[in-house]
From Swiss-Prot:
Proteolytic cleavage and subsequent release of the propeptide trigger a major conformation change, leading to the formation of a heptameric pre-pore that then inserts into the host membrane. GO terms for molecular function: toxin activity. The record marks 374, 390 as: Important for heptamerization. It comes from Aeromonas hydrophila. This is Aerolysin-4. InterPro entries: Aerolysin-like_C, Aerolysin/haemolysin_CS, Aerolysn, APT_dom, APT_N_sf, CTDL_fold. One of its GO terms (cellular component) is host cell plasma membrane. Homodimer in solution; homoheptamer in the host membrane. After binding to GPI-anchored proteins in target membranes and proteolytic removal of the C-terminal propeptide, the protein assembles into a heptameric pre-pore complex. A further conformation change leads to insertion into the host membrane.
Length: 492
């Protein structure tokens, strides 16, 4: 019996520890519902909000209550309206604040990128800001949902239609057409959407290339010499190794001037295409057009392990080649920009966190692209909308209550949709390399052979090389620091 009691106590303690280990989950005010079904009674797939949850979003709940309203929470608690300063205390009420048992995450979907064809910078911008379906309407509806007035032209009753797009310095302004007159309070004060501060960042994973034109390897030099065994025993335990540095000369041309504005976020290495040995790097935060050609040096080696009979020599042949390669290339650049909304806020309802009712003129800038700060980040404000006092700009819970969660998710996904511009050009390179070291049939020798024009190398055990290497000539062909060595094999 004592053993059973101890086991039961252990289960209780384990349950408490598991409950304590579970982290608190956010409660999004836009998903709250007030049910008038009795004390702590909710509709299907809802549960009562507990005291801790209500405390975390008290200002949001109180803002949705009548002056003297009292509504229930879980476990015998109630929350009281603004006339009671939102007090939370034990009590009972006929209505209950409830929350979904399986709440929607409410995340902003990430859409596939909007690809803009390659062109000059102004071409890329023009295509973006004149795209009605993918840009003008989504940004216009964003302004409308936030409470900006008159986000449309005089010749249409719909948001985002009859809009004029004009160049403004290095940016663009989108505003409803004001021709022909209008009716309504300050209807001539159309909300404007300014698009400015464009930036372009190279996406290295987007590399594509067209048809590759690659020349067959061209023989530029043949070096012939001898491996000579002057000893009385066959020699097969030595490696003959050719080492050299070779330069690959490369160049790239950029089809459009937009490449001058494209930067690399991280150090970028050019992808290898074909058989050329190439190592091109562009430093982080550099213009794509800052490096359009150069030379890269690669250290290479070839080895062979010949078997040379006693008092014999075998011919050694090394062939040196060059190869050319060229192809058109394309990368994508991620486009980012500032989106500035300017106009007056509607008195009948707006999403500024203080909800002013005096129709104030309001400017606010969002950054579409990499995170800059909280005030300009739609995604940050949206994700933190469950924390009262954290988001001191727009009341996204209000926009959801007014327009619905799916509507806001769909609109913000379009506003935040990635935009990519094509960067195209042509690439070419020339490289040099050595073929395999070829070994011929042995030839008997009567005595050691020497040549004043040859490189004479010995392993100190009777095997030596006589191979002519003209450093100046080889350098002119693109081969530098050429060396031949004969060394005991490491894995005999």
């Amino acid at each position: 019996m004592k053993k059973l009691k101890i086991t039961g106590l252990s289960l209780i303690i384990s349950g408490l520890l598991m409950a304590q280990a579970q982290a608190a989950e956010p409660v999004y005010p836009d998903q709250l519902r007030l049910f008038s079904l009795g004390q702590e009674v909710c509709g299907d797939k809802y549960r009562p909000v507990n005291r801790e949850e209500a405390q975390s979003i008290k200002s949001n709940i109180v803002g949705m209550m009548g002056q003297w309203q009292i509504s229930g929470l879980a476990n015998g608690w109630v929350i009281m309206g603004p006339g009671y300063n939102g007090e939370i205390k034990p009590g009972s009420a006929s209505s209950t604040w409830c929350y979904p048992t399986n709440p929607a995450t409410g995340e902003i979907p990430t859409l596939s990128a909007l690809d803009i064809p390659d062109g000059d910078e102004v071409d890329v911008q023009w295509r973006l800001v004149h795209d009605s379906a993918n840009f003008i309407k989504p940004t216009s509806y964003l302004a409308h949902y936030l409470g900006y007035a008159w986000v449309g032209g005089n010749h249409s009753q719909y948001v985002g239609e009859d809009m004029d797009v004009t160049r403004d310095g290095d940016g663009w302004v989108i505003r409803g057409n004001n021709d022909g007159g209008c009716d309504g309070y300050r209807c001539g004060d159309k909300t404007s959407i300014k698009v400015s501060n464009f930036a372009y960042n190279l996406d290295p994973d987007s590399f594509k290339h067209g048809d590759v034109t690659q020349s067959d390897r061209q023989l530029v030099k043949t070096v012939v010499g001898w491996a000579i065994n002057d000893s009385d025993t066959p020699q097969s335990g030595y490696d003959v190794t050719l080492r050299y540095d070779t330069a690959t000369n490369w160049s790239k041309t950029n089809t459009y001037g937009l490449s001058e504005k494209v930067t690399t976020k991280n150090k970028f290495k050019w992808p290898l295409v074909g058989e050329t040995e190439l190592s091109i790097e562009i430093a982080a935060n550099q213009s794509w057009a800052s490096q359009n050609g150069g030379s890269t040096t690669t250290s290479l080696s070839q080895s062979v392990r010949p078997t040379v009979p006693a008092h014999s020599k075998i011919p050694v042949k090394i062939e040196l080649y060059k190869a050319d390669i060229s192809y058109p290339y394309e990368f994508k650049a991620d486009v980012s920009y500032d989106l500035t909304l300017s106009g007056f806020l509607r008195w009948g309802g707006n999403a500024w966190y203080t909800h002013p009712d005096n129709r104030p003129n309001w400017n606010h800038t969002f950054v579409i692209g990499p995170y800059k700060d909280k005030a300009s980040s739609i995604r940050y404000q949206w994700d933190k909308r469950y924390i009262p006092g954290e988001v001191k700009w727009w009341d996204w819970n209000w926009t959801i209550q007014q327009n619905g969660l799916p509507t806001m998710q769909n609109n913000l996904a379009k506003v935040l949709r990635p935009v990519r511009a094509g960067i195209t050009g042509d690439f070419s390179a020339e490289s040099q390399f050595a073929g395999n070291i070829e070994i011929g049939a042995p030839v008997p020798v009567a005595a050691a052979s020497h040549s004043s024009r040859a490189r004479n190398l010995s392993a100190g055990q009777g095997l030596r090389l006589e191979i002519p290497l003209d450093a100046q000539e080889l350098s002119g062909l693109g081969f530098n620091n050429v060396s031949l060595s004969v060394t005991p094999a490491a894995n005999q």
